[in-house]
């Protein structure tokens, strides 16, 4: 159970962090602080990548059937790959990845929920 809870925490942090990347310039202009405005687009995206990876690895140790949910991290990692070298100047391009996340969340969420309640 603890693996699932920590994985969920990592997953949430990764999602919020990457979601903030696309707004770095606008948030800085509005004097809004976020992890992305503090450490920058590239570092935030890489941090999100590590958190998704950690979530997947934690779920892999959770025991069956929860361990099958580890595979759900793979598409998120794949979506982040093109953005690992993003800059603060190109931060708005992260919106393309974020939009993919929104659709993926419907499917991954449904699958993970079914695995965890079974």
Predicted regions and their residues:
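Multi-pass alpha-helical membrane architecture of UbiA-family
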Residues: 1-118
């Amino acid at each position: 159970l603890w693996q699932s809870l920590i994985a969920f925490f990592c997953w949430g942090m990764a999602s919020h962090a990457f979601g903030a990347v696309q707004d770095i310039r606008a948030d800085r202009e509005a004097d809004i602080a976020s992890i992305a405005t503090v450490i920058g687009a590239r570092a935030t995206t890489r941090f999100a990548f590590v958190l998704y990876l950690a979530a997947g690895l934690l779920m892999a140790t959770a025991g069956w059937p929860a361990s099958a949910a580890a595979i759900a991290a793979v598409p998120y990692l794949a979506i982040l790959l093109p953005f690992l070298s993003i800059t603060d100047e190109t931060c708005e391009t992260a919106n393309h990845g974020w939009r993919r996340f929104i659709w993926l969340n419907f499917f991954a969420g449904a699958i993970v929920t079914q695995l965890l309640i079974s």
